[in-house]
A protein has these predicted regions:
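Local cysteine-cluster metal-coordination motifs and their immediate loop/turn environment
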Residues: 16-29
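C-terminal scaffold of the Radical SAM
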Residues: 6-10, 27-54, 59-299
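Long, contiguous juxta-domain segments that are non-catalytic but functionally important
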Residues: 1-3
Length: 299
């Protein structure tokens, strides 16, 4: 009896929502404080996943990324539902990591049971800055007092590689010393992965100043034992992100959700960015697809 070789892919679930204003990422994101809307979005994504499962039966998922915005804004039970659905409808490698871009406030007693049941392996905390004077411009909360509970109580990051940080660089109102302080704070904590996100919009520093911050971060992170495995992405040895590595090395990407980009069999397919269209027709490939072009054309 012949054994069918499965096609290795990585998977992304796109959650283009933010938990705060403003956003510094330069993409169009939706302020996600409407619980009913977020639940409808999850149901729509579930329909899209089910509708495409049969056509992707020859694929094996090597890594899953929950991103595109603050994915943790979705209710923990809804995320658990989606991941259970994926594992029941798709071939998922036994050791496939599941990583999530996370607002620190969502690491709490209400969500963690669902996150643990979903087998999330790393939480990329959107801290943006660890300099106390910058919290007023970068966030609505100062998480300093909560970090011990997040780090040791919920994530147990000191005993497992479960915590990453997202830091913002290249912002006008954050001094070079403030950014340096943030990076040094990272090196003192049980962090296994760092994503450096450049500030976008009116507060963006010029290219030279932003690059100077990036260069300084590279030096500090290298001295602390981190390895740069992709632009602006750093990890402790062995903790490199399999989703980003796979995508960067040309592995096909299955993506679901609003504005998602799927790369498969030499083609890139783009989902609609219209929320109402997606909510109403997520299971209909033709209704939610806005473009299908060869990879070379898209690049």
């Amino acid at each position: 009896m012949e054994t069918t070789t499965l096609h290795p892919v990585v998977m992304k679930l796109n959650f283009p929502f933010i938990t705060r204003k403003p956003s510094f990422c330069g993409r169009t994101l939706i302020e996600g404080h409407n619980t009913e809307l977020l639940h409808r979005y999850v149901l729509a994504m579930a329909l899209e996943l089910k509708a495409n499962a049969a056509d992707l039966a020859d694929c094996e998922v090597q890594a899953i990324r929950l991103g595109g915005g603050s994915a943790s804004i979705i209710n923990g039970s809804d995320l658990d539902h989606l991941l259970r659905l994926i594992r029941s409808c798709y071939h998922v490698a036994e050791d496939a990591p599941v990583t999530m871009r996370t607002c620190p406030a969502d690491i709490n007693g209400a969500n963690m049971p669902f996150y643990n049941r979903s087998h999330l392996t790393r939480y990329d905390l959107e801290l943006y800055s660890l300099e106390p004077l910058d919290f007023c411009t970068l966030d609505t909360l100062n998480y300093s007092e909560q970090m011990p509970y997040i780090t040791h109580g919920f994530l147990r990051a000191d005993r497992r590689d479960s915590m990453g940080f997202v830091l913002l660089y290249g912002k006008k109102t954050v001094s070079r010393w403030g950014f340096r302080h943030s990076v040094l704070e990272v090196t003192c904590r049980p962090v296994c992965h760092v994503l450096l996100q450049r500030c976008a919009g009116a507060d963006m520093l010029d290219d030279a100043a932003a690059q100077a911050q990036l260069d300084e971060a590279a030096q500090l992170l290298t001295e602390a034992g981190f390895v740069q495995y992709l632009p602006r992405r750093w990890a402790k040895p062995g903790c490199e992100d399999k989703f980003w590595q796979g995508a960067a090395n040309g592995m096909d990407v299955l993506a679901f959700g609003l504005s998602a980009y799927t790369r498969l069999d030499g083609m890139i397919t783009t989902n609609t960015s219209d929320l109402n269209t997606y909510l109403a027709h997520s299971a209909d490939y033709e209704q939610i697809t806005v473009s299908t072009v060869p990879v070379q054309t898209a690049e």
